[in-house]
Design a protein with these regions (language model features):
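Bacterial N-terminal signal peptides
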Residues: 13-26
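Aromatic- and Gly/Pro-enriched helix-to-coil junctions and flexible linker segments
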Residues: 28-809
């Protein structure tokens, strides 16, 4: 001991006084390296337990990836473009460039998985960096050289808090700056961002989950071959590929080609499901340079209607990887569907004398491009699965919908004109004459012509309005009950006849029936509106596009929304129509007032026979009666308080429903404190699968929506006093913002506490009792339950929820 003291003194400046000496000794000793400074990069204790046989990817690894990783790395907005939904996504790796960049002046090169590159080497040429070991292969190197492993280990070294909110150094905002370290950059990243391990800003993996992933990575991340079509699907694929490429035998080559092109441009993002196959077995329709019977070689174009530059074969290939809710849109193919297509497209009498070009002004305008196909056939095809096509612009590859969704209300109802109704906008002659007026900015692709575009397309819309006015100016009004015959009734059995759309800030969802209280607005959609929405925001929308492309799409969507809402207004008395229209928006529609033809259209009397002073409510009720069961069951929780609306269910379910009825009374200023979409698990006291789920949806009211660039609180001139709540007994939406968990015997107290919220402090106290924060030790257990519950509710339509928007509350 003396020797060590004297040695220390010799190395330090000697000062008088025993206390000072001790202080100096302490200071000197602190200069020694930390015992953990040079610890091993890998966890050797886990390597000692490495099994000889390969870890099963599908049986052991994939479930962990789906439940803990894909929940944030599943869509285009996955951090660092690291999509963990498939083997190809894992091998592709990460990229520092953001897909969503609303301010870029030039379009980015697309990086769509399974489309824009097919091999790992091709992705490296597109500047994607590996997250797995691609060097010397052994179990140690497989971990040392794996960014994925290093991220997992970083979380184990620096676990997050297990109570309360996350600290401010966790940035969970969508537009946060992303750091995407390569292997060479990882040590610096770990030093600067010690809490940046994975899962980021979420609870740690369990020891078992972590060990399984580490063992798999140490083994070299073995992944099985891609799934192949099942025997049941193989036969149907041959039949469908024959139909699409060869027709029925009685159709001309031109007719076959035009119909196949039309179907592809509408189904290119569908998850196809074949009759008789497993509920979770899906396929994709692609354009290939190879004929049926040969391996598919996808023709990659930026948009589905771009020139393929080579002979096209329409092929069906197995969907690979995990199914995420945000991009999961199912389209059923069956013998019955094939008969329907033959009836609408192949057996219908019409001639195709020539095929439309792939030039943008033609290809982006389906009214012109497919004029040879009868409007009735096209419209009935869209109506058969109207929800699917509406979903196209609020789901699909556009994982963030600021562009399209910032111009729609938070809750509204949608119905459609009957395809057999004798109205001008559904007639072939009228649409063919006005087709040039129905061009959209999709034809501009990525050309930046913002102001010129607005003026140009406004002029076209004016001409279209004037054409409609001229066509109906001599028509007299019809009784409101007779006017119902203009509305599509879905043949009395198709649930697509009535839809409800919910907007959740920059995402949305659509469901069958009239859901929620009577909405502020509604749409009536005709063929051209539905078709133009698809070509503007699905077929023609490019998430890699530039500022001009995104702004032009938003501006034109204003016109389409207005057209659908104005059709609804035409079913109201003219004397009330303009007043109602003005109340809907004080700002968003000011620019519409000077569109030539709108005022005249608004003043024309189309209906008569209203009996109350609230014609809008009366119209909603007329639609409910007319559509019957297709409009829904009256919505016992949100709208109908009569016992006749009460669903058949157990006493405890009815008890929960009645309690949730009171939660729908939450309205006004306090709603802004609440999450956009909150999932509620009501524990029924038995098995987990017997618990029930609710979704609490905040419906925000707006004076106007003015910009697509800034956060809502900065740019939306909100009408907070008219905010409302909708509650449904199922899981609605793809991006839950928060989870609540409550016992059935506490359900009344839950709602009482919810309704008592008046400020942020009240809400935090409510969350402390019922909420599942990002720090909760039970967070993953409940997140798993909600995904499992969704699968129970919708065995075929469900997908993995995305937790990118989960709040830190």
């Amino acid at each position: 001991m003396y020797l060590s003291v004297s040695t220390a003194i010799s190395k330090c400046t000697v000062l008088t006084g025993f206390v000072l000496l001790c202080f100096i000794l302490s200071a000197c000793s602190s200069s020694e390296k930390s015992i953990t400074a040079e610890q091993a990069t890998v966890e050797y204790d886990l390597l000692y337990t490495l099994p000889e046989e390969n870890i099963s990817f599908k049986g052991e690894v994939q479930p962990i990836l789906e439940n803990r990783c894909v929940v944030c790395h599943g869509c285009y907005d996955a951090p660092c473009q690291l999509k963990l939904t498939s083997a190809e996504g894992i091998h592709r790796g990460s990229n520092k460039e953001k897909v969503y960049d609303a301010a870029r002046l030039t379009a980015a090169k697309p990086t769509r998985l399974f489309i824009d590159a097919m091999t790992t080497e091709e992705w490296r040429q597109k500047d994607f960096k590996p997250v797995l070991n691609e060097g010397d292969v052994n179990k140690v190197r497989n971990l040392e050289n794996s960014v994925m492993y290093r991220m997992l280990r970083q979380k184990q070294l620096y676990p997050q808090a297990r109570t309360g909110m996350l600290s401010d150094d966790f940035d969970v905002t969508l537009d946060r700056a992303q750091t995407c370290p390569t292997l060479d950059e990882f040590d610096d990243y770990a030093a600067k961002h010690p809490k940046g391990g994975m899962p980021y800003a979420m609870p740690n993996l369990s020891r078992k989950e972590h060990t399984t992933l580490v063992h798999w990575l140490a083994q070299g991340a073995p992944i099985p071959d891609d799934d192949v079509p099942s025997k049941v699907a193989e036969k149907q694929i041959k039949q469908w590929e024959t139909l699409l490429n060869n027709g029925t035998g009685n159709t001309s080559d031109n007719k076959t080609s035009l119909v196949a092109r039309y179907l592809y441009e509408h189904l290119f993002q569908a998850h196809l499901h074949f009759e008789g196959t497993d509920d979770r077995e899906f396929y994709r329709l692609v354009r290939s340079s190879t004929a049926p019977g040969k391996p598919v070689e996808v023709i990659a174009t930026r948009r589905p209607y771009n020139d393929p530059a080579k002979k096209v074969y329409y092929r069906i290939t197995r969907h690979q990887g995990s199914i995420v809710a945000k991009t999961h849109m199912v389209y059923e193919l069956s013998g019955k569907r094939m008969q329907r297509f033959e009836e609408l497209f192949y057996d219908a009498e019409y001639e195709v004398t020539s095929l439309p070009s792939y030039e943008p002004d033609m290809a982006s305008n389906p009214i012109k491009a497919f004029a040879a196909i009868p409007v009735s056939s096209r419209y009935k095809f869209l109506l058969d699965e109207a929800r699917f096509f509406i979903e196209g612009f609020i789901k699909g590859p556009v994982c963030r919908g600021q562009t399209a969704l910032s111009v729609i209300e938070d809750q509204f109802w949608v119905v459609f004109f009957d395809p057999d109704a004798d109205i001008m906008p559904l007639k072939d002659d009228f649409l063919n004459k006005t087709a040039n007026y129905l061009a959209s900015p999709a034809e501009l692709e990525d050309n930046f012509k913002l102001l010129a575009s607005k003026t140009h397309y406004k002029t076209l819309i004016e001409k279209y309005f004037q054409s409609k006015v001229a066509a109906v100016k001599n028509n007299g009004p019809v009784d409101i009950r007779d006017a119902m015959n203009y509305i599509w009734k879905g043949g009395g059995k198709n649930p697509n006849a009535a839809l409800t759309i919910f907007r959740h800030l920059d995402s949305a969802s659509v469901n069958f029936g009239f859901i929620g209280d009577y909405p502020e607005t509604a749409w009536v959609i005709d063929y051209s509106v539905l078709e133009r929405i698809h070509y503007l925001l699905v077929a023609g929308y490019d998430v890699y596009g530039n500022l001009g492309h995104q702004l032009n799409a938003r501006l034109y969507m204003d016109f389409l929304r207005t057209e659908g809402e104005d059709y609804f207004l035409t079913l109201l008395p003219a004397e009330k129509r303009q007043l109602i229209r003005d109340e809907w928006y004080q700002g968003i529609r000011k620019s519409d007032r000077n569109i030539a033809g709108v005022d005249l259209w608004m003043n024309m009397e189309f209906v008569s026979g209203y009996k109350t002073g609230n014609p809008q409510r009366e119209l909603y009720q007329q639609l409910e009666r007319y559509l019957g069961p297709l409009a829904g069951d009256g919505d016992y929780i949100n709208r109908c308080r009569d016992e006749g609306c009460q669903p058949k269910a157990s006493k405890n379910v009815i008890r929960a429903d009645k309690a949730m009825q009171r939660a729908t009374k939450m309205e006004g200023l306090v709603v802004k404190i609440l999450p956009d979409v909150a999932f509620v698990r009501v524990k029924m006291g038995g098995k987990p699968e017997n618990d029930i789920a609710y979704t609490m949806i905040s419906n925000k009211a707006y004076h106007s929506v003015t910009s697509m660039f800034q956060h809502e609180s900065l740019h939306d001139r909100r009408d907070y006093r008219n905010d409302t709540q909708t509650v449904v007994r199922w899981l609605e939406g793809s991006y839950p913002d928060f989870f609540y968990v409550v016992e059935i015997d506490d359900i009344e107290n839950f709602v009482d506490g919810y309704n008592a919220i008046e400020n942020r402090k009240d809400y935090e106290q409510f969350v402390a009792r019922y909420g599942q924060r990002r720090t909760s030790e039970d967070f993953w257990k409940h997140a798993d339950w909600f995904n499992q519950q969704y699968a129970r509710e919708q065995p075929r339509l469900s997908g993995i929820f995305d937790l990118n928007r989960y709040q830190n509350r």
